[in-house]
A protein has these predicted regions:
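Residue-level signal for inorganic ion chemistry
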Residues: 43, 79, 101, 123, ...
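ALDH superfamily catalytic-core signature
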Residues: 46, 241-382, 445, 491-492
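Conserved C-terminal structural/oligomerization subdomain of aldehyde/semialdehyde dehydrogenase
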Residues: 42-48, 231, 268, 322, ...
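N-terminal Rossmann-like NAD(P)+-binding subdomain of aldehyde/semialdehyde dehydrogenases
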Residues: 23-144
Length: 492
């Protein structure tokens, strides 16, 4: 869905006299916007929405702050029960929620169903394991007794993307609600119906008012709220530019931030790999969600001994993908999320080709309504080209031929991003050796980078910092307080 933003007249608002007045005046200096969403399959207008006014958001923050005072003392049993109800509702409403995802951002319906299932699994995972992850940690100091108490910190803000509108929220909201924090979510402006559906699910599950709140505002207004002292931590999944802006705003009030800023994952194929298996995974790793995944396999680095075979089979597989309506079960390649996304990706391909890259397959927009672009393979890519340094967010694969394993590792690391990567080999120890040398947050052997509730997710370099999912993800926004007992009047 494309977000078409247009000004809406705002009546003057009177703010209560407290520490947030200056910030609220700053926020009021920007016009409130209206947002019109467009189905990327056919570029037809779906619905129009009004952005929340600053006064409404001010009330939401105040309500969240008040809710935190009771929620932080709620038992793990009660918090887990709420999350289990949320997961159950997601599963019961899977069909309608999946259709909503597909309508708003163009994901294949079958993949939308998978996203809802994974989101529910994440919520259940933290309901089942949160208490264990947050248990007191006993220490053994030289004198006395001590332990670490893990406590919630307050109101959190999550800035979430459109490409996985339920999954991204689940991995932010579920662990933090289980901790005892409360969450505000500023979702991408092109998935407003998904955003509203998530808030409605929490309400239906019996969440207290203020525990989970959707902030329907444009990205231009976010930084002022990040600086609000009542918000104690911020998480963002988005672009490098958005991450830098958020980190700067959070730094002004010295609050914790977690950033996941995309990637350009290397997919290394060594000469001893099962090529047919590698090709099958390459298609899935590159084309899942029409290539719009932060951890999608984007750079295919293949040793010379098997490069021709891999490229021929990979090309054949992509050539046969059926393009069409994402609601059609036979469709294998749907539209990008918006016309703007398709224009940007086509421009990246053109700039790369103009600089000398070769097109093995595709390379153009598809002549039909909607945000479609052909499945594309580029070769002969050199430093300085768009395809070399930029993240290609769509069905475009960059293919590199290298002499050996050592060259593959060097090329894999020659990227500003460091989110994920994968290596294909029949030798487990060799795969581990390569994985150890790749500078990323995640490496998978004989599988493209993937996600599941019990594995940590996050990157290095310009892919951001911090971790989500697993036991590591639940500890990002906690106060780890040292508590020490002493039986000595004076140990010295």
């Amino acid at each position: 869905v494309t977000a078409v933003i247009f000004p809406v007249k705002l009546k003057p608002q009177i703010c209560r006299d407290n520490s947030s007045v200056t910030l609220l005046v700053k926020k009021l200096s920007l016009p409130v916007m209206g947002i019109q969403t467009i189905n990327p399959f056919n570029n037809v207008v779906v619905k129009s929405f009004d952005e929340m006014t600053p006064a409404v958001i001010e009330a939401a923050i105040a309500r969240a702050e008040q809710t935190f005072e009771t929620w932080k003392n709620t038992s793990f049993k009660e918090k887990a029960a709420l999350l289990h109800r949320v997961a159950h509702i997601m599963r019961v409403k899977s069909t309608q929620l999946s259709k909503l995802i597909t309508l708003e951002m163009g994901k294949l319906y079958a993949q939308s169903k998978g996203e809802i299932a994974l989101s529910a699994d994440i919520v259940d995972y933290y309901a089942d394991n949160g208490e264990r992850f947050l248990a007191d940690e006993k220490l053994n100091p030289e004198f006395g007794e001590a332990y670490i108490k893990k406590s919630p910190i307050g109101v959190l803000l999550g800035v979430e993307p459109w490409n996985f509108p339920f999954y991204q929220v689940a991995r932010f909201a579920a662990p933090n609600i289980m901790i005892g924090n409360v969450v505000l979510v500023k979702h991408a402006s092109n998935v407003p119906q998904c955003a509203q559906a998530i808030e409605d699910i929490f309400k239906e599950a019996g969440a207290p008012e203020g525990l989970y709140t959707n902030l329907f505002i444009s990205g231009a207004h976010v930084s002022g709220y990040i600086e609000d002292d009542r918000i104690k931590g911020v998480s963002l999944t988005g672009s490098e530019l958005a991450g830098a802006s958020l980190a700067s705003a959070a730094g002004k009030s010295l609050k914790k931030s977690v950033l996941e800023l995309g990637g350009s994952d290397a997919f290394i194929v060594l000469e001893d790999a099962d090529i047919d298996q590698a090709v099958d995974w390459a298609v899935i790793g590159r084309m899942n969600n029409t290539g719009q995944c932060c951890v999608a396999a984007k750079r295919f680095i293949v040793v010379d001994a098997v490069a021709d075979e891999f490229l021929a089979k990979f090309t054949a597989k992509l050539t046969g993908l059926k393009v069409g309506d994402p609601m059609d079960s036979e469709t294998q390649l749907g539209p990008l999320s918006s016309e703007g996304a398709a224009v940007q990706l086509a421009d990246q391909v053109k700039r790369s080709v103009d600089a000398g890259a070769k097109v093995v397959l595709g390379g153009k927009r598809i002549d039909r309504p909607g945000a479609f672009i052909e499945a594309t393979i580029l070769t002969d890519i050199l430093p300085g080209m768009a395809a070399y340094h930029e993240e290609l967010f769509g069905p475009v694969a960059s293919f590199y031929r290298v002499a050996n394993e050592a060259e593959a590792i060097i090329l894999a690391n020659d990227s500003p991003f460091g989110l994920g990567g994968s290596v294909f080999t029949s030798d487990k120890k060799r795969g581990q050796n390569v994985a150890d040398q790749i500078d990323t947050g995640m490496v998978f052997i004989n599988h493209p980078t993937w996600t599941q509730p019990d594995l940590p997710f996050g990157g290095t370099k310009r892919s951001g910092y911090g971790r989500e999912l697993s036991g590591l993800g639940i500890e990002e926004f906690v106060n780890k307080k040292l508590i020490r007992f002493s039986q000595y009047a004076d140990p010295f």
